[in-house]
Amino acid sequence: MNTDELAGLIKSRRSIRAWQNKPVPEELLMQAVELATWAPNGANAQNWYFYIVLNKSVIKAISDASQAGMSYMASWPETTKSGGMVPPRPPQGQIVPPPPRRSALGDAPAMILVGKTRRENPRDKIIDERAKVDERATRMVEWNVTLNPSMQSVSAGIAYLLLVLHQMGLGATWMTGPLATAKGDIEAILKTPSNMDIIAMIPVGYPADSPTGTRKPVSEVCQVLK
């Protein structure tokens, strides 16, 4: 694959939220996960874990938990006061593609949930201890939380996973929103170990639509220091 072919693959990938009523072969999903584990990761800790869900009852349970969590938050007076959970409109004049057709989360033929295992980092302990007596170390604690190397590592694996699924002709979308309101419920369904956090939900299937997309010019998001 040359650079132009790779660019075509990357630029044609879209978040898919509507799927054909067609099963996804388990072997394809296993292959995609195996390739995802070749993503770069801090200290080669490989602190990711993947749950491939093909059982429709489990997918429905996860979908129901997600909806219940969002409905719970929607019922808060704070949510009403802030104008709801819908993201703000883009700036006037900005070109926005039409929203993709959506299926219910429970309609996805398959789902991959991505976990991040917790592990102790000696550096974290050292910085935390020093922060008790050192103002700069206190700032370093904040920086370390922002950097979150283990989250970055798993996110790299997810990016690889989405690209491989696209190459296989499968559509997927990277979701975190439902976990903000139902993470504990979803982890209970999966029976995750106590040292693991589910950080992403990825419904997968054969696409039922072909959404378009736009990107900011690279000049708006990149600076060259000469």
Which residues make up each language-model segment?
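Acidic, surface-exposed loops and disordered segments
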Residues: 1-226
